[in-house]
Amino acid sequence: MDKDAIFRSLLRVVVFLTAISTWAAPAIRGRFTVRQPDGTFLTIEQFGDEHHHWTSTSDGTLVVNQGGAYYVAAIDDAGCLSATSILAHEAQERDSKEQQLIAVQTSRIALFHQRRDEVLMTRAMTIPSTGGYLPHKGTTRILTILAAFQDSTFTINEPVQAYEQYLNSDIQTDMGNKNHNNLTSVQQYFKICSQGQFCPQFDIVGPVTLPHELAYYGGTSETGQDEMFSTFCKDAVTQAKDMIPDWTVYDNDGDGNVEMVCIIYAGYGQNQGGGVETIWAKASHQNIDVGNGLRINYFNCSPEHYYSLDNIDAQGVAIKDYINGTGVFIHEMSHCMGLPDLYQTYNKFLNNQGMESWDVMDYGFDNHNSFAPTAYTAWEQEVMGWKEMETVTTSRHINGLLPLVEGGTAYKIVNAAKENEYIVIESVMKRGINQYAYNSGLLVYHVDYPSSKVDMLDAPNNELGHPRVAVVPASGLLLNVGLSGTGKEYTQAQWRASMGASVFPGTAQVTSLTSDMNLPNYYFYVNDDATMPVGFDLYDITESADGISFDIRVSGEDDIHSPLVTTTPDQDFYTLQGVRVAVPTKGNIYIHQEHLMIWR
């Protein structure tokens, strides 16, 4: 058994050490302006995911939310954060005492990062592989509970009708809360990505009111370690239980388990700028009994509202209660279907380490502020059993390659020594469901999956320097969103530019892909320390409204031009073995007038 298999087996042994596991969307990258109790304004940023997260000012000073105000954080010997008595301010407004506290914080920052890594590593070693995922073919019935709190109720107009449209409708209209910002409903998204093979039907109940206030469930810890999430799920089910005449309709595969229940809760999510007392959007395995031998496997939980700089006033107060985008909901639901996070869950960020906004399981859930999440990639569609990729074995010309969501095909170049490792080639067009993508072009990425099965616990891109699902960037550099932003190594504008230049030709106008270009992730692994060339090169990559055209060549075959028009040959043709042929055969490579050509 290889070490990857051993590691996965160990993870499964640890199933018996824990009963509950959660997976979540990362914090929405962006700055939020808040008004402090002394009347000053402070710009803050949020990082991490629901397992461990933190907040900093625009220059990187750690702060703690206490009672709605942000205080300079103290770091204790265990690396934990607590609020000091000093309100946080922008750099130019800090007095000497605040500056001294920040200097002490800076001297102890290594303790905080060590604690963060320990928390995340512990989580990685105690995640159970539960199975029992939501079926993803045909029509699947899914219960959706609208849950309010004793001190927080739904404020969007007509919540039941609004979420019927949000979840099930083919048309998005504004009902007073920017509902039409969402490009599609959740159902429509999956119908498009599966070419009509998967049609989830969401049955809405509520709103129900839970027995406690929001902070009881959301907790008060700045790092999110005290959420009462299991109690939240149980209370929501208890309040909705009598509204469900027959729970068995939500057991879609007849195994005695309700695969997934969705909860949309009133207010904001902590992952999108909500206060410390709010709940972080997540997918979670809870195993809750609903009677008659039925248990609920997974919960998909996301908030009512979207927090953005364009819908708050100068005091940091929401002035427009926008409905949330579908991106977070779809990301979490995809976990309940078995897909893992493709972002780096350890928060040790590295460039060229993932899919970034090209994948809904990475940062693509937040495209267009999460109102237009990225379509499933070819890899995900194949994992779901919706569309198989075509394996490339010989040189060929591809003309007008369309995206899969438009009926196109995707190709993969497989490592002959390892069937789980391959290069994926697919078309992405900035239109339709992907109209808010960062560019159109040929998306190329490397898959080196550690097992023959995909599981939501996998975290394939956590091995720094050896990502398992990662883009081959045309420009040679795909920045990690975690390294961009105010006070970071890169600006948000630079990150966006790297996205646009990561496809072929892209903004970098790269029209070929060969091994000697030494682009990140364009190779196969021999072992952990050595790589080898892929064995195929791409040439003459062009983009038009009709799709992406290019040549795939076996490495070492020179000067293969665009395919000839099929006609009666007027000169001699020879095979690569030097045998003359009178009539060329479609799809084969020949020597013709001292050039290699593919006959069509």
Question: In which residue ranges do the predicted regions lie?
Answer:
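C-terminal tail/sorting-segment detector
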Residues: 5, 588-600
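N-terminal prosegments of processed precursors
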Residues: 23-131, 416
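Short, solvent-exposed loop/turn elements at domain surfaces
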Residues: 42-44, 52-56, 72, 81-83, ...
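Propeptide-to-catalytic entry region of secreted or membrane-anchored zinc metalloproteases
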Residues: 99-329, 340-349, 447, 452-554
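Extracellular hydrolytic enzyme modules, especially secreted metalloproteases
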Residues: 260-262, 266-439, 449-450
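Residue-level detector of functionally pivotal "anchor" positions at catalytic/ligand-binding pockets or at interdomain
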Residues: 553-580
